[in-house]
Amino acid sequence: MANKQDLIAEVAAKTGLTKKDSEKAVNAFGEVVTEFLAKGEKVQLIGFGTFETRERAAREGRNPQTGEAIKIAATVVPAFKAGKALKDAVK
């Protein structure tokens, strides 16, 4: 499994940027995507995929320790849908 440092190193290797500059780029990408999603906007990268938010309905759950029924409130969660090129590359 690759982590953030692995991603930064690969970006540096592929672009010729320093690791410090690559880290800034990776961090900026994450921040920008987060800002768009927080405003309720989608981020579509053709061929790669789409970052979006989805509404999760309220539901009933259980406390695993007591078995007591609890209500879980509706919420908005981030989601990613892979694009065709990414799906094909992973096959």
UniProtKB/Swiss-Prot annotation:
GO biological process, one term: chromosome condensation
Keyword DNA-binding: yes
UniProt-recorded Gene Ontology molecular function terms: DNA binding; structural constituent of chromatin
Superkingdom assignment: Bacteria
UniProt-listed InterPro entries: Hist_DNA-bd, Histone-like_DNA-bd_CS, IHF-like_DNA-bd_dom_sf
UniProt keyword list: DNA condensation, DNA-binding
GO cellular component, one term: cytosol
Keyword DNA-binding: yes
Stored CDD domains: HU
Quaternary structure annotation from Swiss-Prot or TrEMBL: Homodimer.
Family per record: Belongs to the bacterial histone-like protein family.
PANTHER family to which the protein is assigned, alphabetical: DNA-BINDING PROTEIN HU (PTHR33175), DNA-BINDING PROTEIN HU-BETA (PTHR33175:SF3)
Protein task: Histone-like DNA-binding protein which is capable of wrapping DNA to stabilize it, and thus to prevent its denaturation under extreme environmental conditions.
The protein's name: DNA-binding protein HU
Species per Swiss-Prot/TrEMBL record: Lactococcus lactis subsp. lactis (strain IL1403) (Streptococcus lactis)
Organism taxonomic ancestry: Bacteria, Bacillati, Bacillota, Bacilli, Lactobacillales
